[in-house]
């Protein structure tokens, strides 16, 4: 049975309680055998009421929580990790903003580069908002205490990054990336956590969010989460729920992502019957360490690093004559892959490329790239002052995610409206798809994305609601299906360990949805990923406890990954063109007439259904005109 404990914060918590006696009819009832005739289980349910709930405590989640607290909202932040272990900590290169500290710059030039980088799949209203707000966001971080690297004059140091230019692509390389050496994400996350602690944000650390609590009218009323420490279940009722749960890089075998990047928020949205957008666009970072997958920042090339093949040739001069090694990431990753395919890879198996930093002055490496020097020594056994680093394109970022407008509000198609807002639900950061990155993200736009749109979510909440507003009670059966499903999953007695299914999924994604794709590999991938999902019905969870059950948590994460992976593969198979990170060998050209539109992937009855919505080509106002599509050359 349920034992329901009500806790009131600001507004009285819902007094609704229900009984759970092996609830039948759960979503996955056909999947999981409990191996017992008595399916009754006892779960303690704790109810909370907040003005706003943020799920995730990385850069986007913390910035949203800070903003909400500043506006006076009673805010909870739920996170499965201690906040400073969130994956923002791994970001290295920096944060883009047209500060003009190294040369003249303009946010409009930054916007042009971002639209071009997105291969014209980015929404230009959202891109305008992000780039225009960028200088303000960086100065705000400086005021929070972020220890940026400095020029001799004391200004924030800015380095060159890929795909960035002056004067709408006509003025040469831009120096737009503000950084804290090569540990910018670490500095940012700790700075924001300090600010969040200063405000009255209530943190629920090591709570695993399970599902959204959706009302019958289609609005979101909060989330249900599992406290991993004691096994209690918590229903968080709120006027606004902000998902900042990061990407799902761990759907692939080799990724720069932490093992916690499992697309939990995306899957929660998909299970609620809402779409995910543009998941086929997965960024491969050009320089992951060969064999280990650890990231070597693009800043290493921004500081003068050079990619060379087995012949010692600086081959990027052939593929991107102007930008060379600082072309956009999808361009560099494809170029490296082609060099390897054509037999000019390095190493005994000729299956990777060398990144040379050994021509740079040691003092530059020590001051600007200290983390890279350490990472290369540990994971590649390389002294960067003397030897090149072996690198290979590695899964790094998900351009797709939960579709939102530039306020951070989650949107879907309703009737003739492709931008219908879901009341009470927002998203920010890598989990969201605003879409400011379109088909390919520019380096150093992700840290910008998380702080600009985390703040935008908080500001939008302040515009549409007030602290302490009365909330509707939760629906009588709120969370019931989730608890039934959790119980069956915890007691599942199949034959396949979680790790076996996960490894199979990762190999399918790595082999069939990689840098280059064909109809054959994608069709095979769709069949294989569907079978991988079916195999999840035979999953085995050995640990039956509710306290620190890592077996159960990894299985929950695997389900989330499988949903993301399935929508990714089916979306990629359907898109018959090459655009940004989605490179088809059988459809090599960008087809704006038919395919300049966002893919929407729905998870319905454990199958993927696809739909489409238009790209926002219009800008917010007359400050800048729309950038019409043209050939993307670097």
Curated annotation (Swiss-Prot):
Major location category of this protein: mitochondrion
GO BP, sorted A to Z: mitochondrial electron transport, succinate to ubiquinone; tricarboxylic acid cycle
Transit peptide range per the UniProt entry: 1-32
Positions annotated to bind FAD: 56-61, 79-94, 264, 430, 446-447
UniProt EC number: 1.3.5.1
Active site: 329 (proton acceptor)
Tissue expression per record: Ubiquitous. Preferentially expressed in flowers and inflorescences.
Keyword field: Electron transport, FAD, Flavoprotein, Membrane, Mitochondrion, Mitochondrion inner membrane, Oxidoreductase, Transit peptide, Transport, Tricarboxylic acid cycle
InterPro entries to which the protein is assigned, alphabetical: FAD-dep_OxRdtase_2_FAD-bd (IPR003953), FAD/NAD-bd_sf (IPR036188), FRD_SDH_FAD_BS (IPR003952), Fum_R/Succ_DH_flav-like_C_sf (IPR037099), Fum_Rdtase/Succ_DH_flav-like_C (IPR015939), SdhA/FrdA/AprA (IPR030664), Succ_DH/fumarate_Rdtase_cat_sf (IPR027477), Succ_DH_flav_su_fwd (IPR011281)
GO molecular function, one term: ATP binding
NCBIfam families cross-referenced by the UniProt entry: sdhA_forward, sdhA_frdA_Gneg
Complex and partners: Component of complex II composed of eight subunits in plants: four classical SDH subunits SDH1, SDH2, SDH3 and SDH4 (a flavoprotein (FP), an iron-sulfur protein (IP), and a cytochrome b composed of a large and a small subunit.), as well as four subunits unknown in mitochondria from bacteria and heterotrophic eukaryotes.
Protein name (Swiss-Prot/TrEMBL): Succinate dehydrogenase [ubiquinone] flavoprotein subunit 1, mitochondrial
Source organism per UniProt: Arabidopsis thaliana (Mouse-ear cress)
Gene: SDH1-1
């Amino acid at each position: 049975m349920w034992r329901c404990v009500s806790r009131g914060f600001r507004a009285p918590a819902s007094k609704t309680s229900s009984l759970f006696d092996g609830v039948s009819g759960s979503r996955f009832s056909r999947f999981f055998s409990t191996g017992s005739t008595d399916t009754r289980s006892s779960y303690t349910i704790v109810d909370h009421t907040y003005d706003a709930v943020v799920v995730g405590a990385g850069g986007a989640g913390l910035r949203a929580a800070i903003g909400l607290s500043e506006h006076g909202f009673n805010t909870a932040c739920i996170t499965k990790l201690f906040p400073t272990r969130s994956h923002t900590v791994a970001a290295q290169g920096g944060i883009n903003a047209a500060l003009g500290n190294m040369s003249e710059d303009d946010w409009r030039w930054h916007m042009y580069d971002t639209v071009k980088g997105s291969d014209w799949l980015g929404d230009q209203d959202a891109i305008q908002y992000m780039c225009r707000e960028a200088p303000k966001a960086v100065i705000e971080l400086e005021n929070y205490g972020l220890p940026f690297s400095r020029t001799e004059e004391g200004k924030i140091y800015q380095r060159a990054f890929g795909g960035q230019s002056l004067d709408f692509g006509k003025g040469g390389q831009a120096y737009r990336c503000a950084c804290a050496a090569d540990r910018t994400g670490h500095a940012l996350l700790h700075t924001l956590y300090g600010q969040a602690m200063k405000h009255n944000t209530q943190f629920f650390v090591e709570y695993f969010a399970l599902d959204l609590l959706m009302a019958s009218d289609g609005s979101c009323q909060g989330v249900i989460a599992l406290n991993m420490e004691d096994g209690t279940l918590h229903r968080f009722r709120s006027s606004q729920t902000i998902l900042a749960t990061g990407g799902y890089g761990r759907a692939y075998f080799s990724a720069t992502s932490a093992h916690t990047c499992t697309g939990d928020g995306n899957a929660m949205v998909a299970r609620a019957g809402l779409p995910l957008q543009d998941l086929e666009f997965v960024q491969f970072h050009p320089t992951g360490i060969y064999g280990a997958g650890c990231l070597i920042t693009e800043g290493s090339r921004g500081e003068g690093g050079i990619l060379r093949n087995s012949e010692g040739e600086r081959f990027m001069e052939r593929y991107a004559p102007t930008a060379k090694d600082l072309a956009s990431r999808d361009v560099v990753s494809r170029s490296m892959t082609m060099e390897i395919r054509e037999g000019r890879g390095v190493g005994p198996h000729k299956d990777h490329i060398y990144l040379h930093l050994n021509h740079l002055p040691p003092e530059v490496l020590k001051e600007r790239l200290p983390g890279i020097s350490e990472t290369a020594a540990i994971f590649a056994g390389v002294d960067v002052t003397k030897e090149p680093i072996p690198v290979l394109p590695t899964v790094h970022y998900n351009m797709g995610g939960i579709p939102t407008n530039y306020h951070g509000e989650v949107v879907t198609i309703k009737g003739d409206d492709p931008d219908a807002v879901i009341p009470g639900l927002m998203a920010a950061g890598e989990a969201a798809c605003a879409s400011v990155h379109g088909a390919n993200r520019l380096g150093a736009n992700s840290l910008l994305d998380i702080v600009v749109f985390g703040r935008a979510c908080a500001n939008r909440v302040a515009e549409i609601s007030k602290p302490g507003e009365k909330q509707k009670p939760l629906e009588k059966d709120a969370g019931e299906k989730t608890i039934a499903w959790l119980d069956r999953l915890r007691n599942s007695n199949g034959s396949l360990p979680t790790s076996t299914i996960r490894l199979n999924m990762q190999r399918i994604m790595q082999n069939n949805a990689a840098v280059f794709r064909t109809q054959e590999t994608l069709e095979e991938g769709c069949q294989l990923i569907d079978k991988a999902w079916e195999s999840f019905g035979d999953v085995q969870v050995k640990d039956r406890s509710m306290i620190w059950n890592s077996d159960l948590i990894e299985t929950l994460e695997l389900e989330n990954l499988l949903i993301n992976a399935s929508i990714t593969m089916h979306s990629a198979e359907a898109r018959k063109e090459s655009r940004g990170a989605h490179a088809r060998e059988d459809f090599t050209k960008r087809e704006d007439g038919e395919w300049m539109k966002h893919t929407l992937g729905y998870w319905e009855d454990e199958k993927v259904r696809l739909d489409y919505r238009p790209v926002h080509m219009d800008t917010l106002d007359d400050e800048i005109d729309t950038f019409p599509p043209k050939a993307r050359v670097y």
